[in-house]
């Protein structure tokens, strides 16, 4: 069992793209929902769906075989391909 919160996983993805929570423009999750623990490991999808926007990127939940993480794509055309999700 891999218990995580969206706040933890989003924080990691924000860092990987050179952004931080101060760059967030809007998020569909409440502060409380960001801190709900769920099993992000393989199995069933448990994390609440969301979309989060910064000035540069759009972040969203991704899943494979029940394992959940955060993906992102540029808000504007940047000539960079998006990897398979």
What kind of feature is each model-predicted range?
Residues 29-66:
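Amphipathic, interaction-prone secondary-structure segments
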Residues 65-73:
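Amphipathic alpha-helical scaffolding segments
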Residues 72-85:
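Compact, glycine/acidic-enriched structural inserts
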